From Swiss-Prot:
Keyword Zinc attached: no
Function: Involved in control of cellular proliferation. Onconcogenic modifier contributing to the tumor suppressor function of DNMT3B.
Stated name of the protein: Protein MENT
Lineage, opening ranks: Eukaryota, Metazoa, Chordata, Craniata, Vertebrata
Chain spans, region Disordered: 115-196
Gene assigned in the entry: MENT
Polar residues: bias regions: 127-155
UniProt xrefs under Pfam families: PMSI1
Amino acid sequence: MVPAAGALLWVLLLNLGPRAAGAQGLTQTPTEMQRVSLRFGGPMTRSYRSTARTGLPRKTRIILEDENDAMADADRLAGPAAAELLAATVSTGFSRSSAINEEDGSSEEGVVINAGKDSTSRELPSATPNTAGSSSTRFIANSQEPEIRLTSSLPRSPGRSTEDLPGSQATLSQWSTPGSTPSRWPSPSPTAMPSPEDLRLVLMPWGPWHCHCKSGTMSRSRSGKLHGLSGRLRVGALSQLRTEHKPCTYQQCPCNRLREECPLDTSLCTDTNCASQSTTSTRTTTTPFPTIHLRSSPSLPPASPCPALAFWKRVRIGLEDIWNSLSSVFTEMQPIDRNQR
């Protein structure tokens, strides 16, 4: 009986194989009356009865849900042949893989074919196959669809994440604390402003002395520039002008000796040796000043009896200092001497 049942099952599977491939994954088992359930992603289940169109007599009836060991052996022998035949007829579709996925609403690509002997293994495909009382075979007809699904929704590859990591580290390394030099900062352009530690103030040489004979003083000024800065600054942006005031001398200023405009030479010019004495006094009184110092207040002559005259002298000295500072910035403009006005 076992070889006859196996041969009969093989003939029926050969006849019904192409028909099952055209019915979107429906496989008709070689039974006269069998219940077939269709599930296409929704909770709705449709059941109908199909009659195998064969000329078999009614007494040769094959029942798959029988618990007979002979039928189980026949099913086990015909299982590999049926699996190979159905694997050749690949069909696509959607079906629920388990009852849990049916509740979630998630679907699995590929037709999942369950060939079992009892209704429990047919309703729950996740049950343990090949148990003592039942025989179950579960395979995926379309085995390439899961791979295609994976390639269409590829996650971020680890190689790409490692390539993006140095870029993020470079971006983070640019945000450093003030005063520090970032390691991966791009090279600055030649016209860009250098860092504060690279800027140095360089004072220019002193200009010529400007005599103020009526006030008895002389002054000179010098400007400064930022070393390491390419380009030009606007006038007045540096604000590093230095001015030096000293009492005038007859050696450096063409002042009138008779009017005693220079106060340092007044007490020394008492006789004909005034020129030699003034030269000596100039050498002794001229002292070097530091290179960078704050502006000192101009030395004023002894207090005059008229307060208004002393006030306007201070105003004139201040205006002359401003003019000399501006003239040192504009090199083409020469300061105007008071005696030439």
